[in-house]
């Protein structure tokens, strides 16, 4: 293409993304061409020399459509300054003129027929691949699991319920406040993933404490295949872009750096985001008369970013003032007065009790009846009468109605271990060991015997192994003996420092020959993956994985159930994080905790504090942070020494305070909130659906067809795993294999959870979606000619098989694909114009077909060109009623769904101020735009297969 021929206003169509509709040239700038696709609102930039575009040029006899909807038949085409002007007649015989700039953005093209008559005929298997890809894409867009089933995680009911409930809102603003170990990060990842897939969000900003950056990076990449850009001072400074944040879809930023860098803050505010995610939001300090810099920064971002997810500790841990501060970030108009919030919170207690009575299936108390009537009025009375008549559906509906009207039920989700089943038990094994003389001689310092080996690591420089700390530390001898005793089990060892982990690996190798691998923050993600895979391998893997404190963040080793705490962390939350590597939902064994510690040392006293005062080994300790804050100033001096009497008194006081706090937490449990957060059975249905999808063989069968078509070689790796490599015949270098050298994949969820070095292929995986995009965005498979061997057909009989796609071109955020997904409508015409598609399936035909050489196929097509062109019109006439029926049904269902949701939220707003006006306005706009775009739904000829009886 002569570069001078690109003119602003010209209409072009993308060769690789035909679904975008007509494009308009916006600008030609240097070596770049900018094209706007008004139908979807997308803008693309192409290299000028090889832009994958085709000029839209209609010929006399073609029908064209104006953007206002009227049509005309072209009689004459003229060109003026590079732009086309069409002259023609409308159906009413009016003469009209239509400049190409005013063409409808939704016009579709018969690219398949153009290719067929140009002699571009494809190999036979490609037609079937295109059909199956269209069918599967249509099913996926309608699936309630879309964005939920593809995570590398065990499907867990409460997580799936929260993810669907939140991700299906436009611009959700919610607080995720589950107890530790219930998977807030996974919930956030599921929400991000589903919002991105559905188009409800396009750009996401994740703010985290600096020490959690790596954990988030690993979680998002490993579990959700989300490529997150980690921003820090160096990356920001080195970027040549005017605004470095604008170049990424998902940005991960540390709050500590951001609050100190005003230039980065300005860039972040200007970048434009759809969703803000803030982890550890309870550390944002707010008081009525003063706020921290971090809180003020998040508050500014929350004012300009439509969607906000705050991940935080439970409301009971925070205290009501701090909890109110989080809610205030989500909706400052709704949560503006702390005292009013306190009063409102008290009003919901009777409703929670009524819901509990309904779920207990007993007779309802007078108080419960009063609460139900007070909240639901006559509607509640009617449902109550049905419940007492034995109507279980009415009972479920009554529970749902009460949950919906709960004060913060739409903005706050909080699950507790008490409410969620599936956690393992814990057993503690303590091993007091004698203090070696080398440690006793250490100079006094800050907790010298919590991590006494550190002093010797700093001193050891002469390379003499005999002087190394692990030669005399009794914990090492104990560890070797314990590992030998547990040789048939996988054992996870965690210590505070990376240097200690490396030393322990040396000690095990040199002193015992025990197979161990190490895991610490100095390793790259790839190195950690390999270490984790080596540990997970049942047959040839390491028995032991030795982790540093930071190195194991975000990892899941629940296939093991023996945990050695080689030392103890200085904070109970870190202790819970360590145990949480194994203590997760889905762990099938009792967790065995092995804790060696040196007698008469800070180690022993810290062990006693965690066990006797906090009970932190045998149970989770939601009060740990509060107790540490309260007792820390007295605890730390006593760790290093001090009288036994004072120490025993502190243990007793700590235990009493913990028990009092736990009783307070239990009495303050918001049962209504727990029920709403758990989903009251909806999450279990999602789990069952995902398990059913996992057991389906449709994906492996489809992917084998895809691999064969693109020249991807697959071979067995092990049970449930394959190795994929590009072959010499690889068709497209753009196939999203992920690694030019090859990758190992599995379709098995359990295998993927144990082996993080393997790609977990689901319908949502980038390789699968990218492969489907390649098929549908390219033209391969939209023309085919074959010989059909069927004795019932006379030789020379011609059957014409056509695939039409019925679709609405619309921005993804409207999610019209749920009601009118692009669907292949198949037509099989015989010589008499009868449609046989309902009687003869595509698979039945495939079994009877043989390939035809391209030269012969092309000769036949050219000879039959006029006949075929007429049959295309006959086929379209057969398909149009089916298309119109689909569109009418989609409009009806879409309008009904929107009206139902609008009615629900409008009624809810009257009793629950958590419903924002912006939500209702957004839904009304969505309804209008959606119906208008469904009216413009189009039918296009996607693929042609000519079958000649032989």
From Swiss-Prot:
Q: Report the InterPro entries cross-referenced here.
A: Helicase_ATP-bd (IPR014001), Helicase_C-like (IPR001650), Helicase_RapA (IPR023949), P-loop_NTPase (IPR027417), RapA_C (IPR022737), SNF2-like_sf (IPR038718), SNF2/RAD54-like_C (IPR049730), SNF2_N (IPR000330)
Q: What is its EC number?
A: 3.6.4.-
Where does the chain bind ATP? 178-185
The yes or no answer to whether the keyword Ligase is present is no
Q: Which residues cross the membrane?
A: none
Task: Give GO MF terms, alphabetically.
Answer: ATP binding; chromatin binding; DNA binding; helicase activity; hydrolase activity, acting on acid anhydrides; nucleosome array spacer activity
Biological processes per GO annotation: positive regulation of transcription by RNA polymerase II
The short sequence motif called DEAH box sits at 279-282
Against Pfam families, the record matches this protein to: Helicase_C, RapA_C, SNF2-rel_dom, Tudor_1_RapA, Tudor_RapA
Location of the Helicase ATP-binding domain: 165-333
| Alphabetical UniProt keywords | Activator, ATP-binding, DNA-binding, Helicase, Hydrolase, Nucleotide-binding, Transcription, Transcription regulation
PANTHER family on file: DNA ANNEALING HELICASE AND ENDONUCLEASE ZRANB3 FAMILY MEMBER (PTHR45766), SWI_SNF-RELATED MATRIX-ASSOCIATED ACTIN-DEPENDENT REGULATOR OF CHROMATIN SUBFAMILY A-LIKE PROTEIN 1 (PTHR45766:SF6)
According to its UniProt entry, the function of this protein is described as: Transcription regulator that activates transcription by stimulating RNA polymerase (RNAP) recycling in case of stress conditions such as supercoiled DNA or high salt concentrations. Probably acts by releasing the RNAP, when it is trapped or immobilized on tightly supercoiled DNA. Does not activate transcription on linear DNA. Probably not involved in DNA repair.
Q: How does it assemble?
A: Interacts with the RNAP. Has a higher affinity for the core RNAP than for the holoenzyme. Its ATPase activity is stimulated by binding to RNAP.
Q: Say which family it is in.
A: Belongs to the SNF2/RAD54 helicase family. RapA subfamily.
Protein name, per record: RNA polymerase-associated protein RapA
């Amino acid at each position: 293409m002569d570069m001078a021929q690109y003119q602003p206003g010209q209409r072009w169509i993308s060769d690789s993304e035909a679904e975008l509709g007509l494009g308009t040239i916006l600008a030609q700038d240097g070596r770049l061409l900018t094209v706007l696709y008004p139908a979807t609102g997308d803008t693309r930039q192409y290299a000028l020399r090889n832009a994958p575009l085709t000029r839209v040029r209609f010929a006399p006899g073609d029908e064209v459509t104006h953007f206002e909807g009227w049509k005309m038949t072209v009689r004459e085409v003229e060109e003026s300054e590079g732009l086309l002007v069409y002259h023609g007649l409308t159906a009413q015989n009016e003469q009209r003129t239509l400049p190409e700039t005013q063409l409808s953005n939704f016009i579709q093209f018969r690219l398949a027929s153009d290719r067929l008559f140009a002699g571009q005929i494809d190999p036979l298997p490609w037609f079937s691949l295109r059909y199956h890809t269209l069918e599967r894409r249509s099913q996926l867009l309608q699936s309630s699991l879309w964005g939920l089933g593809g995570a590398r995680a065990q499907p867990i009911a409460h997580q799936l319920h929260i993810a669907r409930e939140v991700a299906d809102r436009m611009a959700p603003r919610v607080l995720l406040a589950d107890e530790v170990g219930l998977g807030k990060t996974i919930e956030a990842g599921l929400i991000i993933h589903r919002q991105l897939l559905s188009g409800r969000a396009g750009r996401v900003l994740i703010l985290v404490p600096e020490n959690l950056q790596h954990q988030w990076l690993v979680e998002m990449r490993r579990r959700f295949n989300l490529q997150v850009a980690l921003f820090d001072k160096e990356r920001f400074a080195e970027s040549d872009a005017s605004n470095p944040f604008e170049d990424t879809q998902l940005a991960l930023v540390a709050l500590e750096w951001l609050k100190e860098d005003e230039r980065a803050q300005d860039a972040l505010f200007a970048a434009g985001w759809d969703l803000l995610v803030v982890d550890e939001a309870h550390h944002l300090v707010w008081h009525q008369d003063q706020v921290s810099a971090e809180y003020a920064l998040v508050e500014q971002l929350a004012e300009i970013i439509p969607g906000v997810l705050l991940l935080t500790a439970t409301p009971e841990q925070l205290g009501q003032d701090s909890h109110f501060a989080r809610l205030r970030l989500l909706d400052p108009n709704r949560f503006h007065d702390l005292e009013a919030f306190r009063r409102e919170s008290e009003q919901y207690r009777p409703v929670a009790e009524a819901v509990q009575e309904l779920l207990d299936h007993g007779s309802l108390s007078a108080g419960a009846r009063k609460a139900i009537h007070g909240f639901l009025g006559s509607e509640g009375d009617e449902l109550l009468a049905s419940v007492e008549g034995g109507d279980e559906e009415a009972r479920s509906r009554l529970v749902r109605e009460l949950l919906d009207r709960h004060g913060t039920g739409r903005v706050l989700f909080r699950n507790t271990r008490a409410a969620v089943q599936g956690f393992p038990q814990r057993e503690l094994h303590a091993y007091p060991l004698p203090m070696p003389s080398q440690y006793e001689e250490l100079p006094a310092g800050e907790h010298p015997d919590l991590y006494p080996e550190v002093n010797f690591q700093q001193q050891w420089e002469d390379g003499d192994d005999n002087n190394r700390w692990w030669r005399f530390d009794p914990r090492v001898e104990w560890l070797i003996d314990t590992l030998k005793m547990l040789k048939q089990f996988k054992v996870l060892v965690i210590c505070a420092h990376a240097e200690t982990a490396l030393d322990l690996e040396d000690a095990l190798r040199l002193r015992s020959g025990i197979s161990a691998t190490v895991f610490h923050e100095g390793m790259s993600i790839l190195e950690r993956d390999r270490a984790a895979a080596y540990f997970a391998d049942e047959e040839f893997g390491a028995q032991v994985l030795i982790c540093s404190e930071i190195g194991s963040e975000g990892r899941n080793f629940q296939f093991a159930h023996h945990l050695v705490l080689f030392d103890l962390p200085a904070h109970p939350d870190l202790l819970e994080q360590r145990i949480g590597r194994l203590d997760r939902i889905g762990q099938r064994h009792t967790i065995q905790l092995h804790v060696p510690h040196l007698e008469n040392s800070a180690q022993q006293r810290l062990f006693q504090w965690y066990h006797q005062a906090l009970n932190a080994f045998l149970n989770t300790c939601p009060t740990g942070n509060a107790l540490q804050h309260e007792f820390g100033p007295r605890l730390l001096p006593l760790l290093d020494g001090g009288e036994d009497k004072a120490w025993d008194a502190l243990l007793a006081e700590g235990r009493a305070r913990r028990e009092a706090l736990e009783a307070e937490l239990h009495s303050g449990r918001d049962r209504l909130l727990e029920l709403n957060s758990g989903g009251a059975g909806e999450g279990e249905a999602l789990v069952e659906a995902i398990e059913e999808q996992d057991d389906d063989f449709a994906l492996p069968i489809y992917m084998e067809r895809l691999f064969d078509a693109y020249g991807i070689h697959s071979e067995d790796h092990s049970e449930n795993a394959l190795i994929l490599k590009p072959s010499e015949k690889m068709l497209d270098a753009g196939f999203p294999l992920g690694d030019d050298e090859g990758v190992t994949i599995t379709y098995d969820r359990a295998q993927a959870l144990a082996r993080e070095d393997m790609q977990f292929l689901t319908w949502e995986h980038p390789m699968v979606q990218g492969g489907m995009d390649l098929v549908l965005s390219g033209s391969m498979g939209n023309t085919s000619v074959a010989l059909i061997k069927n004795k019932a057909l006379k030789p020379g009989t011609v059957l014409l098989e056509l695939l039409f796609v019925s679709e609405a071109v619309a921005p993804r955020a409207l999610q019209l694909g749920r009601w009118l997904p692009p669907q292949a409508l198949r037509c099989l015409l015989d010589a008499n114009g009868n449609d046989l598609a309902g009687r003869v399936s595509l698979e039945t035909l495939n079994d009877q077909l043989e390939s035809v050489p391209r030269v012969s196929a092309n000769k036949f097509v050219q000879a039959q060109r006029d006949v075929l062109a007429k049959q295309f019109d006959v086929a379209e006439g057969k398909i149009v009623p089916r298309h119109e029926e689909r569109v009418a049904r989609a409009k009806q269902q879409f309008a009904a769904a929107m009206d139902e949701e609008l009615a629900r939220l409008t009624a809810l707003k009257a009793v629950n101020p958590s419903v924002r006006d912006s939500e209702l306005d957004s839904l009304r706009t969505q309804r209008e735009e959606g119906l208008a775009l469904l009216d413009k739904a189009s039918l296009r000829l996607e693929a042609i297969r000519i079958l000649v009886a032989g």
